[in-house]
Curated annotation (Swiss-Prot):
The gene is MYO3. Residues 1120-1182 form the SH3 domain. It comes from Saccharomyces cerevisiae (strain ATCC 204508 / S288c) (Baker's yeast). This is Myosin-3. One of two redundant type-I myosins implicated in the organization of the actin cytoskeleton. Required for proper actin cytoskeleton polarization and for the internalization step in endocytosis. At the cell cortex, assembles in patch-like structures together with proteins from the actin-polymerizing machinery and promotes actin assembly. Functions redundantly with LAS17 as actin nucleation-promoting factor (NPF) for the Arp2/3 complex. Motor domain phosphorylation by PAK kinases CLA4 and STE20 promotes CDC42-regulated actin assembly. The myosin motor domain displays actin-stimulated ATPase activity and generates a mechanochemical force. The keyword Repeat applies. Residues 36-715 form the Myosin motor domain. SMART domains: MYSc (SM00242), SH3 (SM00326). Residues 1-20, 951-1015, 1029-1141, 1217-1272 are annotated as: Disordered.
Length: 1272
């Protein structure tokens, strides 16, 4: 039969919002790439160099270039644009830890910026790898991310960010060049510090330059290029520059054309020139400064075109003086003095402390060419230093710097066919960086574990400190110190200095990382063995410009040229000036010191091939890099170590919010030992013990997941606190809204009445005195709500049916029911249907199951105006025939528990419809063929239904046709009363799931006591319909009139019975056994899940039971310690293990009564305990105190005479009368007994329940304010 799933709803009642704490709905990520290989090498099943190389190769072939080793990023140069640096990709990494997103350089940048903000510590990233592995690109992407992540609307902050980004194209133009291995190889070292203010916005910056490869200015090996700026300038110079500085194409200059390569495949020099000019303007270089920079570049190019010939004396002579004249014009010096400085060398002798003679020594063409190149290199080197200093001046324009993020972009390890002084300096710096990596990761980590007494298995690794000492040591002297001594010994002759250096190298033969081979020597670097040439190495180490060239520059009238060169040389100074080796050692040590003051991050870059091909992967080359970078040792230490360590003090300062014992409302409240605070934090954050260790001064967290969990909880702390305040405030506002709605509804009902109740009364008048009534239709809460399937709402079953059928009009009435379906030669069938009524149309909707899904189809679409008549029987059945006007289809014969409401609404929509009530229903079974259905009374019919067979309806006797509906009970609390609420649980977890249907279901499984939902007065009609159309299985038991339990009525709702009535009560109660055989069989299932009633007890009219005396409530008696009760009816139970099945007459102990109408009972022998309906139990009385049976004869006679008349009344009333601890008996209108009839029993029982709930709710309301702030 039809099931009412949802009761009537008010428009102002909204579905509760879903709580954000719930698991989000899973969605398919179409953009997520399939995982290739392993994203973190610490997860490798087998740790070896080969397995690492194989994993990197697999990912490289699939376009994935980034892989982790813990927090260290491995980057393989793809030699192509993968489209992974867009703004969309950048945004996806904001606020994410590295486990939430794929490996990426943006993840390293996000981690650095997050740690800067969270721990207020300087950060740096060390990018290492050989030349062409992608170090410069990684540095650019980190700068890109930090500039984007540090959003600020301040104009000054935005200007600084633009300046920082502009340093990339500017310094790349002047410091990078195309080599055989890399089209954009850094030929200098750069450490960029981005400084942040207290709001962690970039406010300043500083660039430190390391060892520019100035030799590249004057010469390159075949197929390499000079610095980018020379090709940009010569190809993209404006006409003004071409006219002022005589700029030609790069093929016209020796310095740019000698190597035979003036173009590169991936480089657009003209476009890059425009980018360089834009970067200059962004940084703040004015036009005059730009002009002077390009004037110096033009001078360098023209200096390279100065050629020398040998004169008659074998000395050098300038081949074309027009070139020297133009160079003198550009440098703004005297042309003759320039030529003299190029072809002659000034030497000065000394005698002790006295100045000696001065000699002008002529130079041969080779020597003159060397002097020319020295002048060009000196101008470019000093120009580059000036540009770096000028950038720093612009970046320091805004004060307020507090912390910084450093980005180290330095030349990679180099091994060429011929390696000289430049390579030994570059490789030395890379050795120092490797030493930092070892000290800060491998060595320092193990030393920390040992110092902190952490359980640890030592890992062997190679410490390259011995190689660094071999190069930089002072005592005993290293290679660079030996080179300085050779220069001091033979400073005038480069060849003699080289020979002296070769002799001193014999001192290192005992070192296992050094080998001497004729005019070469080998250093066994961490990245491999490198052979260096001795010839000319000492001259490069001098790094000195001839004094006559310095004096020449001192005579210039160009203030810019004077600015970029140092002060005049102190001719009287006897102190040896620092060599290039001294400078690089000093710079490297300063760099190490700077990096050691910051929290480091690491990016290890790998070059997959030497051909710069995006498809080639050289296993041998990559495997070599994997070995010398020490990736295997890094993986082993990472797997055995801890992802995070912090001192107790800083850990508590960071995470004390996570422990209620350490904090309150954001304040640190713990005054005990710091170690105890650490333990409390870890305990309250529920970090497993295996995930951390406590050392002597620090706490160690093993996995990144645990650290991220701590960080996530801390980030959400303030959100959770704000959410608590918001929930409390919203709850307060909702109470005010509910109270206002309640007041408004009450006022409206007092002024104009309830429209739903008015409609019910109108329908009752239409059938007044014509049709027997059902018990549920007499309830005071029964109102004609109309849309019982909630078709007008969204996301309901009714709206789903409405959409399937295609109903667009507003639904006036909807209900489930049945329709009689006739078949030729077979009995008619009762098929389930859905009835939907709009203002114009009445729909009868059929349902079928197809492919395990319910499908709804339109059986009837009846125009309300074409309904001629509605035919009903005069009994209490639910059948009605809808007679149509001149219809070509049969008239529907339908069955619905809300037939009266349907008939009433049809009548309201069409006043012409006739209502016919009689012993039969006449309808057209087929067009123009009238068919008659009869109705008969049968005791064998279902209690809440009927039987249809052979055109006859069999139904039980109903209430008299003139029975009146009960009035709607009044609100017991009045306008000032608070809403009745069920007692709130103090436990936090139960409060979280208050509105969850699943949680209710789970709680029902765990809670043995059946619970009841708070009543909604407007939904009682739906509940009545559900009970009417879904009766519980009938189990008939014999019942006597005297066995009806007495009602426990509150004293303020009852009055004392008269003395005559007391006597009648005694007689009626004593007739319990003698009258049992003469009673009918009625069913008494337990009353579960019935809604609460807030209305006071009322009396109703029941003419069939007017003169039957009913026992009043027994007088109150003292409760024994273990009171005995007797089962008045059979209680078979529903099968739940928490219930105690009983048979009539069983005696049990009652230890606990619940307001919901259940009692906890235990057998007399104590063998079993469970819940039973309170209404089924009566106090047990000893037979010695029972009134003699003979005294009750008169009562039995009366009962027997009237039993046939009140049979239906009792059977229907007993289903609804037993609620809570209140039971009532039937009375008539003229009876003085204050106890109500069975038809009024539901209201009476719910009234008693409501009284008790009001008292409980008052206690709840007193404590409710205190619970608000404890709501998580």
């Amino acid at each position: 039969m039809a099931v009412i799933k949802k009761g009537a709803r008010r428009k102002d009642v909204k579905e509760p919002k879903k709580r954000s704490a719930k698991i989000k709905k899973a969605t398919f990520d179409a953009n997520k790439k399939k995982e290739v290989g392993i994203s973190d090498l610490t997860l490798l099943s087998k740790i070896s160099d080969e397995s690492i190389n194989e994993n990197l190769k697999k990912r490289f072939k699939n376009g994935i270039i980034y892989t982790y080793i813990g927090h260290v990023l491995i980057s393989v140069n793809p030699f192509r644009d993968l489209g992974i640096y867009t703004n969309a990709v950048l945004e996806s990494y904001k606020g994410k830890n590295r486990l939430e997103v794929p490996p990426h350089v943006f993840a390293i940048a996000e981690s650095m910026y997050y740690n800067l903000k969270s721990y207020n510590e300087n950060q740096c990233v060390i990018i290492s790898g050989e030349s062409g592995a992608g170090k410069t690109e990684a540095a650019k992407r980190i700068m890109q991310y930090i500039a984007a992540a540090s959003n600020s609307h301040s104009e000054s902050i935005g200007k600084i960010k633009d300046m920082v980004l502009a340093t990339n194209p500017l310094l790349e133009s002047f410091g990078c060049a195309k080599t055989l291995r890399n089209n954009n190889s850094s030929r200098h070292g750069k450490y960029l510090e981005i400084k942040f203010n207290s709001q962690f916005e970039p406010c300043a910056g500083n660039i430190t330059n390391y060892l520019l490869e100035k030799q590249r200015v004057v010469g390159q090996i075949k197929n390499e290029r000079n610095f980018h700026i020379f090709y940009q300038f010569t190809k993209g110079a404006s006409d003004t520059y071409k006219q002022m500085f005589g700029v030609q194409m790069p093929e016209q200059y020796i310095y740019t054309a000698a190597a035979g390569c003036t173009t590169a495949d991936t480089i657009d020099d003209v476009k890059d020139y425009e980018g360089t000019l834009e970067a200059m303007r962004t940084i703040g270089l004015v036009q005059e400064e730009q002009d002077q920079i390009f004037r110096m570049l033009a001078a360098i190019l023209w200096i390279g075109n100065i050629s020398f010939i040998e004169n008659e004396e074998g000395n050098a002579q300038v081949g074309d003086t027009s070139v020297t004249d133009f160079v003198a014009y550009l440098l703004q010096v005297d042309a003759s003095l320039l030529v003299k400085c190029l072809v002659e060398r000034i030497m000065q002798t000394s005698h002790g402390m006295k100045r000696g003679s001065v000699y002008h020594v002529p130079l041969n063409p080779v020597q003159a060419t060397a002097v020319r190149d020295a002048l060009a290199k000196a101008i470019y080197n000093n120009l580059f230093d000036w540009i770096v200093d000028r950038v720093n001046v612009s970046l320091q324009a805004f004060p307020g710097a507090d912390k910084s993020i450093g980005i180290l972009d330095i030349y990679g390890f180099e091994i060429f066919e011929h390696n000289s002084f430049e390579q030994i300096c570059i490789n030395y710096v890379n050795e120092k960086l490797q030493q930092i990596f070892i000290q800060l990761t491998l060595k320092a980590e193990q030393e920390t574990y040992e110092r902190e007494k952490i359980k640890w298995t030592p890992i062997k690794y190679f410490d390259n400190k011995v190689v660094c000492d071999l190069i930089e040591a002072k005592n005993p002297p290293g290679i660079l110190a030996a080179m300085n001594d050779s220069i001091a010994t033979a400073h005038a002759d480069s060849n003699a200095a080289d020979q002296a250096f070769a002799q001193r190298l014999n001192l290192f033969n005992s070192n296992p990382y050094f080998e001497l081979r004729a005019n070469k020597f080998v250093i066994k670097h961490y990245a491999g063995d490198v052979t260096y040439d001795i010839n000319g190495i000492t001259d490069k180490n001098k790094d000195q410009l001839q004094k006559d060239l310095i004096e020449l520059i001192g005579t210039t009238t160009n203030t810019f040229l004077s600015t970029i060169f140092p002060d005049d040389v102190d001719k009287d100074s006897k102190r040896r000036p620092p060599t290039a080796g001294d400078k690089i050692i000093k710079s490297a040590n300063e760099l190490v010191e700077t990096l050691s003051k910051a929290e480091p991050s690491y990016i290890r870059t790998i070059k997959p091939n030497q051909t710069k091909s995006p498809n080639d992967y050289d296993d041998h080359q990559v495997l070599h890099q994997v070995k010398y970078l020490g990736l295997q040792e890094n993986v082993r230490i990472r797997r055995a170590g801890f992802a995070y360590r912090q001192t107790f003090e800083k850990f508590v300062e960071r995470f004390y919010l996570l422990s209620p014992d350490c904090s309150y409302a954001g304040d640190y409240t713990w005054d005990g030992d710091t170690l105890e605070a650490v333990k409390l934090i870890l305990r309250d954050a529920m970090i497993p013990e295996k995930e951390f260790q406590l050392g002597v001064t620090s706490v160690f967290i093993k996995t990144p997941e645990s650290l991220f969990a701590l960080e996530d909880m801390r980030d959400k702390y303030w959100y959770n606190m704000a959410a608590r305040i918001q929930r409390a405030w919203r709850r307060f506002l909702q109470r005010r809204i509910d109270a206002a709605i309640k007041i408004q509804r009450t006022i409206r009902e007092k002024k104009g009445g309830n429209k739903y109740v008015k409609l019910r009364d109108y329908g009752t008048k239409l059938l007044a005195g014509k049709k027997e009534r059902r018990s549920m239709s007499l309830l005071g809460y029964r109102a004609f709500m109309g849309d019982y399937l909630s078709c007008n709402e969204s996301k309901t079953k009714g709206s789903y049916i409405r959409r399937q059928v295609g109903i667009k009009d507003k639904v006036v009435f909807s209900i489930k029911g049945e329709c009689l379906h006739s078949k030729f030669g077979r009995s008619a069938q009762r098929l389930k249907k859905v009835f939907i009524l709009t203002k114009k149309t009445f729909y009868i909707i059929g349902q079928t199951r197809e492919q395990n899904a319910m499908k709804y189809t339109q059986d009837y679409k009846i125009d309300v105006g074409k309904i001629k008549q509605v035919s009903l029987t005069n009994l209490q059945d639910d059948w009605m025939g809808v007679i149509l006007v001149n219809s070509t289809q049969s008239d529907p014969l339908i069955n619905t528990p809300f037939k009266t409401e349907l008939m009433t609404r049809l009548k309201k929509l069409n006043e012409k419809i006739m209502i016919k009530v009689g012993p039969t229903i006449e309808y057209h079974k087929q067009p123009n063929k009238l068919h008659t259905v009869r109705s008969k009374i049968s005791d064998s019919a279902p209690k809440y239904g009927d039987i249809y067979k052979s055109s006859t309806i069999y139904v039980r006797r109903g209430h008299p046709a003139n029975s009146k509906s009960n009035k709607k009970p009044k609100n017991p609390g009045g306008l000032s009363g608070k809403p009745i609420k069920s007692k709130k649980s103090k436990h936090k977890s139960t409060h979280k799931h208050t509105h969850s249907h699943r949680s209710h279901r789970d709680a029902a499984k765990k809670q043995p006591l059946p619970s009841q939902k708070p009543v909604n007065p407007l939904s009682l009609a739906a509940t009545a319909a559900q009970a009417a159309y879904n009766p519980k299985p009938d189990k008939t038991v014999p019942i006597k009139s005297s066995a009806i339990p007495a009602a426990k009525v509150s004293s303020k709702h009852s009055s004392k019975p008269s003395s005559k009535e007391k006597v009648a009560v005694k007689k009626a109660s004593s007739s319990h056994k003698s009258s049992s055989a003469k009673q009918n069989q009625v069913s008494m299932p337990p009353s579960k899940g019935v809604e609460k009633n807030k209305e006071p007890l009322k009396e109703t009219t029941a003419t069939a039971t007017a003169n039957i005396p009913i026992p009043p409530p027994p007088p109150p008696m003292g409760q024994p310690k273990d009171p005995k009760f007797e089962a008045a009816y059979d209680f078979p139970g529903s099968g739940s293990s928490s219930e105690l099945p009983l048979k009539k007459g069983d005696i049990v102990f009652i230890s606990r009564d619940e307001p919901s109408g259940w009692s906890l009972a235990k057998l007399l022998d104590g063998s079993k305990e469970g819940w039973v309906p309170t209404a089924y139990m009566t106090p047990y009385k000893d037979t010695r105190n029972t009134v003699p049976v003979a005294a009750t004869g008169a009562v039995n006679d009366v009962t027997n005479q009237k039993s046939s008349q009140i049979d239906n009344t009792i059977s229907s009333a007993q289903e609804g009368v037993q609620f809570g601890s209140a039971t009532v008996g039937p009375t008539s209108d003229n009876q003085s007994n204050p106890v109500g009839t069975f038809s009024d029993g539901l209201a009476s029982a719910l009234a008693a329940r409501a009284n008790k709930m009001r008292a409980e709710s008052a206690d709840d309301d007193d404590n409710d304010d205190g619970d608000d702030d404890d709501d998580w």
